[in-house]
Amino acid sequence: MDIKKSLGLAIQRSRKARKITQEDFSEVSSRTYVSTLERGLYSPTVEKVDAIAKVIGIHPLTLLTLSYLIESNDTDSTKILNQIQIELNQLLL
């Protein structure tokens, strides 16, 4: 699965888990645009990912991490979060 589709699924799953409708994004985006994102037809900008995550009530990195877990068909976030922690520590030195 490509990253556009997995990000779309991450948005959709997060939205549904929080019982948010596509219409609830009206302050940041149209329902049609959210639908196209969820179907993996478009790639949102970083600003749009941030805005969408705020509406859902999660950190943007949670949304991105979930999308990579979906892409790799993995449900264990421990490995990817450990990798991120190691890489952040290396980059921040």
Feature locations, PLM:
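A short, Lys/Arg-rich alpha-helix, primarily the initiator
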Residues: M1-A17
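Helix-turn-helix DNA-binding elements, focusing on the entry/boundary residues of the two helices
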Residues: I11, Q22, R31, V46-V49
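Short alpha-helical DNA-recognition segment
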Residues: R18-T36
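Short, basic-rich loop-to-helix N-cap that marks the start of a DNA-contacting helix
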Residues: L41-K54
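Short, charged recognition helix plus adjacent turn
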Residues: L66-L93
